[in-house]
């Protein structure tokens, strides 16, 4: 299972991730990396994706997937991918651009930058990162960086997980992804968590945090085992 971090201005480091350990305890190799766009490797590395989401970051992630696919303990024909927030964005971007993964779970994702501009609590800072303005000023640029534009070609079974009180990536982002996948004829499900914010995986109600993990594992088991 390829795990992609959120942010994108965050990074993976030497700390305990209960989610990774949970999947590993159920028989999966969990692998992760820090692509361009995140922190920890200098300003040039961090700003490499500004104005080009889905460009250098996607390239780095695919190179890492290539590397892992050559490992003797990895079955390259049974690879899954998941992530939340920016990691959810990249998960949808990946399944819209390659069919190499056999299963995907996109969590609290960005799906459409155009509609999100008017509904998210951080559209003001995103304009800075995207080097864009409003949709009226930068429609083509925002649309071209939106995963939903490319979901019509995907073949990857994809589970959508979203939280109904998410103000960062509003629920309509998950709804758009689900509808696009259904129209493409892809195997998909939409899991909605009521009352939960963007940070369900960290601060959500305990039973719902457990349910989220079980939904991811269920989906991966269905297509990878």
Feature names for model-found ranges:
Residues 3, 10, 17-20, 24-25, ...:
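Active-site-proximal cap/loop segments of hydrolase catalytic domains
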